[in-house]
A protein has these predicted regions:
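Long extracytoplasmic/lumenal interhelical loops at the membrane interface
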Residues: 301-316, 331-380
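A membrane-periplasm/extracellular boundary helix in multi-pass inner-membrane enzymes
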Residues: 163-172, 242, 259-306, 319-323, ...
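N-terminal signal-anchor transmembrane segment
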Residues: 1-82, 109, 427
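Transmembrane alpha-helices of multi-pass inner-membrane enzymes
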Residues: 12-16, 388-394, 415-473, 489
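Alpha-helical transmembrane segments of multi-pass inner-membrane proteins
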Residues: 104-108, 148-179, 189, 196-264, ...
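Hydrophobic transmembrane alpha-helices and their immediate junctions
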Residues: 220, 224-227, 260-262, 272, ...
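Hydrophobic, aromatic-rich transmembrane alpha-helices
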Residues: 11-25, 72-86, 210-220, 383-406
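Aromatic-anchored transmembrane helix interface
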Residues: 65-72, 93-104, 115-139, 151-153, ...
Length: 489
């Protein structure tokens, strides 16, 4: 029933977008609507069709099921667009990236310590197919169409999530919890949180933090600034209503990064101007916010103590796995199976006080480690983890260079969104595994991958150009007019 309601909602959104365009409908607008509907579909955690289930609930962050996700259907549409409009004239794929992906896939599948290769196949299949999808996506649309389509889809997402979050927990209408996900679950009565279209408050908080940074990027680049400001506020309230502390902190850190790296990009990071104009005022505002209206999230000392103990126990599990296989890990999507077969709650009792924890063994061996970086280093080992860590550092270090080299702010929206996503990974990834779920990766990976598209960075859009580009174009036009005037008759 939940999937039926999802398709009905998507159909209603499609009709709304088409009717809104009316007589203005063109082929480009139709493509933007297709992007919008796809983006909107990503917010539903049950928007997948399981093909094969391994029959074990202890799968890693990708679970035990091989499934069809929305981007598979979208890929068929992209192939049709490329065949009909592009006549199969598309850019050659990056060969080096292709070999890197294949190397990672072969490396983790051939891992002699990976005793759960079918679980690894699930994640590898998802990642490789998503890479193909992004290649088709980038070859089908311009960066302008991409931003316009994503914007429409995320506006629909934030409106729906906001309304559902108001229904629960604000109005305590518990019937909406399982409306779009029959397996959805909220937290205990001590700290309830909104679920909306996702299966858990933490997953919703993670997803909301990504469209929060997207609308913040639109706001700082002056793209539909008023509507973007409203969506930023709604996204922030959704994060608050999830009661996800990690998502809240990740969103705040991402916002600080946008201010420091983009708004004050002409200043050095620790220069007097950036500290005085950006970091100090924003820090004061955040401190007032966390000690005032949002202090209830951090006031439950008992809940914080229990959460901290659970995280430390999970980190200890990760350390045990790393100590066993530090170089090449135990295989993608396989750490939880390895832990369930090789771990025991007895090893916790000598280190942690578990008297206040409810069924600690069941929690530890049925939930992925609540730290995506520990998951990656356990599953890939140092050989596979260090290149990923190097990529994250490189991505942040080259942000300003990518911003300076771009010729339009449509691309800058993607670039800023990618920066915000990476910051969320760094913050929230240290206390949760939600950023590694495929439901969330559908959006976060799209921002990061598209922000690295050099063809998007090179596109020019005079109707939405930067102030500097506008001045250069006007000076060039004036110089051209003067040259014409001095030409003898």
């Amino acid at each position: 029933m939940d999937r039926v309601l999802i398709f009905v909602t998507l159909g209603f959104a499609l009709m709304f977008f088409i009717i809104r365009e009316g007589t203005r409908m063109t082929k480009v607008r139709l493509y933007e609507i297709i992007i919008a509907v796809y983006t909107f579909s990503c917010c539903f955690s049950r928007m997948y069709i399981p093909l094969f289930n391994l029959g074990d609930d202890s799968g890693g962050s990708f679970g035990p099921s091989l499934a069809i996700w929305p981007f598979y259907a979208m890929s068929l549409v992209l192939i049709w667009i490329i065949a009909r409009d592009k006549r199969w004239r598309i850019r050659r794929p990056n060969i080096w990236l292709f070999f890197v992906l294949l190397a990672y896939a072969g490396y983790t599948l051939a891992n002699p310590y990976n005793a759960y290769r079918m679980y690894t196949v699930i994640e590898v299949f998802y990642l490789l197919s998503f890479a193909v999808f992004m290649y088709l996506f980038a070859n089908s649309f311009s960066v302008k169409s991409v931003i316009r389509g994503i914007y429409m889809g995320l506006v629909a997402t934030v409106v729906l999530n906001f309304l559902l979050s108001i229904c629960y927990p604000v109005l305590n209408m518990e019937g909406v919890i399982k409306l779009y996900d029959s397996e959805a679950a909220t937290r205990s009565d001590e700290r309830v949180g909104a679920v909306a279209t996702m299966g858990h408050p933490n997953v919703l908080g993670t997803y909301a933090s990504y469209y929060f940074v997207f609308f913040a990027a639109c706001f700082v680049t002056a793209y539909k600034r008023q509507l973007s400001a409203v969506c930023v506020g709604m996204a922030f309230l959704i994060i608050v209503m999830t009661a996800s502390r990690s998502a809240l902190m990740a969103s705040i850190v991402a916002l600080v990064a946008i201010v420091v790296f983009y708004i004050y990009r002409r200043y050095k990071l620790l220069s007097f101007q950036s500290v005085l104009k950006g970091i100090i005022p924003l820090g004061i505002f955040i401190a007032l916010l966390l000690t005032g209206p949002l202090s209830f999230l951090f006031s439950d000392v008992e809940d914080l103590d229990e959460m901290t103990t659970s995280r430390l126990m999970h980190y200890y599990c990760g350390y045990e796995i790393f100590e066993d296989h530090p170089l090449i890990g135990v295989g993608l999507n396989a750490h939880l199976n390895y832990l369930a077969e090789n771990g025991s709650a007895m090893m916790f009792e000598q280190i942690f006080d578990m008297t206040d924890l409810y069924q600690p063994e069941e929690f530890m061996f049925s939930n992925p480690i609540h730290n995506i970086w520990i998951i990656l280093i356990d599953e890939l080992g140092l050989v596979g983890f260090l290149p990923l860590l190097g990529f994250v550092i490189w991505y942040i270090a080259t942000f300003k260079r990518r911003t300076r080299s771009s010729r339009n702010r449509y691309y800058n929206i993607l670039n800023i969104s990618g920066l915000g996503v990476v910051c969320c990974w760094l913050v929230q990834g240290n206390s949760d595994w939600a950023p590694l779920t495929p439901q969330v990766l559908n959006l976060s990976l799209m921002f990061v991958v598209l922000s690295l598209n050099r063809h998007y960075a090179a596109e020019e859009h005079p109707e939405f150009e930067s102030v500097e580009a506008y001045k250069r174009r006007m000076r060039a036009a004036e110089a051209s007019d003067e040259a014409i005037e001095v030409v003898p008759a």
